[in-house]
């Protein structure tokens, strides 16, 4: 007699288990806020008067204060060129609501300005020209305006179309090219 074969019962189909939820992406580390309490102001009296005058031009309410979202514009009006990221860090990484609703007075603004002025990583005219020279395919001192618009809207601190239009106004020649040395002089004077 042949040995008995074990008749295996068919296994019931396995229930598909839902895949575990992916772990939430870790929040990017926030840059530490700048401690403004230890900043030593190094301005002359004439500079302080000029800075106060420019600061007060941005006061829309009449309380001698400006909104956080105006700080970068004031600094640029005073000849500085901080990135939005730098200003956000100086302001203590505020929320979008804080950028609109929080206000700072002139005495609170001065240490912020001093931090930007003391920043050793400022780009120079030559740095900007060298960066744009990469796009000068013909080596004639010009770049295509359309290409420059794409660069401004997609690389680094992306600019809005309205900001690009304002910056590019009157910069393109009849062929749609921009003399980048003149363009850099223009943007550094704005």
Curated annotation (Swiss-Prot):
Signal sequence extent: none
A single GO molecular function term of this UniProt record: calcium ion binding
Biased composition (Pro residues): 19-28
Skewed-composition ranges (Basic and acidic residues): 1-17
Tissue: Expressed in fast muscle fibers during skeletal muscle differentiation.
GO biological process: skeletal muscle tissue development
InterPro entries: CALM/Myosin/TropC-like (IPR050230), EF-hand-dom_pair (IPR011992), EF_hand_dom (IPR002048)
Keywords: Repeat
Region entry Disordered, spans: 1-33
GO cellular component terms, A-Z: contractile muscle fiber; myosin II complex
Domain EF-hand positions: 46-81, 123-158
Keyword Repeat in record: yes
Tagged with keyword Disulfide bond: no
Changes seen on gene knockout: Morphant embryos have curved bodies, bent tails and a marked reduction in touch-evoked escape response. Muscle structure is altered and myofibers are sparse and disordered.
Function: Non-regulatory myosin light chain required for proper formation and/or maintenance of myofibers, and thus appropriate muscle function.
Quaternary structure and interacting proteins, as annotated: Myosin is a hexamer of 2 heavy chains and 4 light chains. Does not bind calcium.
Protein name: Myosin, light chain 1, alkali; skeletal, fast
């Amino acid at each position: 007699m042949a040995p008995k074969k074990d008749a295996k019962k068919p296994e019931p189909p396995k229930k598909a288990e839902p895949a575990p939820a992916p772990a939430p992406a870790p929040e990017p580390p926030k840059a530490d806020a700048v401690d403004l309490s230890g900043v030593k102001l190094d301005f002359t009296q004439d500079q302080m008067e000029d800075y106060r005058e420019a600061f007060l031009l941005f006061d829309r309410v009449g309380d001698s204060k400006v909104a956080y979202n105006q700080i970068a514009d004031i600094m640029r009006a005073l000849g500085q060129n901080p990135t939005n990221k730098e200003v956000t860090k100086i302001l203590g990484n505020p929320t979008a609501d804080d950028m609109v609703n929080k206000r700072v007075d002139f005495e609170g603004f001065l240490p912020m300005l001093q931090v930007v002025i003391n920043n050793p990583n400022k780009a120079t005219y030559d740095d900007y020209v060298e960066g744009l020279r990469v796009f000068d395919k013909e080596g004639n001192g010009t770049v295509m305006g359309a290409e420059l618009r794409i660069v401004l809207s997609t690389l680094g601190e992306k600019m809005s179309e309205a900001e690009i239009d304002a910056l590019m106004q009157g910069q393109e020649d009849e062929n749609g090219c921009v003399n980048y040395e003149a363009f850099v002089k223009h943007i550094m004077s704005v």
